[in-house]
Amino acid sequence: MTYPWWSLLPFVAMLACIALLPIIPKTSHWWEKETSQLSVALLLGVPTTIWLFMKAGNGPLISTGVEYVQFIALLFALFVVSGGIHLAGDIKATPRNNTIFLAIGGLLASFIGTTGAAMLLIRPLLETNKERQHRVHTVLFTIFIVANCGGILTPLGDPPLFLGYLHGVPFTWTLTLWKEWLFTLGLLLLTYYSIDRVRYASEDTASIESDDRDVQPLRLHGKINLLFFAIIILSVAFAPSWDGEALAEGHFDSWVDLVPWREVIMFTVAGLSYKLSD
């Protein structure tokens, strides 16, 4: 089924609100309220949902709703488990160390999600660079490398890749993109290292000396969550779940097909992580 071009307008309007309302003086404070954001979402989403239901029936809505639940389950599990890990410590904030931090984050993002990797690394990265005066570029490149470009090697890395996996793209297909991933990551890391060397050279002596004195070894707390990450990865790769299109059409062989085993595992893992983490 095809839809007219103007059916995209509510989505475009939502993106425009997210991008513009926070920076417009007359609407910035209003937009900070969750009730305002919810009002805009309902104003644009409810009429669109009703129109789609009247045009296409409940099949596409059920199928899309199933995908949404599957996506939220993965995001929720990764968010909770990554929140249970704390990488503590404070090493020297040299360009070399910062670049290694970002490189590790760019790799981890493919396996624990861009959100999970960013949550795990941003705190020790900020702690490491707290003595430096020039650190904004480090946060920006963390967003570029860890929270964006890094998560491309598995469907867990980024939401569009996971949605593609739900639509039949093989779990290991994204590994074929390793050359593109390596090129992009290498280019960003080289750019960051060059910028950070210049900014590091412009730091005053007092900041560098303070950074050299305040050094603590890195320590990983909540190690049990590494096991939970492994369980999530295995569940995405091997555990069965709902087939949205089959459910929408009423096609299933037994009650087993009605149980979202993958999501059950994810929510269970998230609950265990919440209970067992430090």
For each predicted feature, which ranges?
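Transmembrane alpha-helix boundary signature
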Residues: 23-27, 47-67, 79-94, 107-120
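Juxtamembrane and boundary regions of transmembrane helices in multi-pass small-molecule transporters
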Residues: 134, 154, 163, 172-216, ...
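Transmembrane helical segments that form the transport core of multi-pass membrane transport proteins
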Residues: 229-278
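Interfacial loop-to-helix junctions that mark the boundaries of transmembrane helices
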Residues: 1-7, 29-39, 58-70, 171-181, ...
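Central hydrophobic cores of alpha-helical transmembrane segments in multi-pass inner-membrane proteins
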Residues: 10-25, 41-52, 70-85, 122-126, ...
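Alpha-helical transmembrane segments and, especially, the helix-loop junctions at the ends
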Residues: 113-118, 137-169, 189-194
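Hydrophobic transmembrane alpha-helices that form the pore/transport pathway of multi-pass ion
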Residues: 96-150
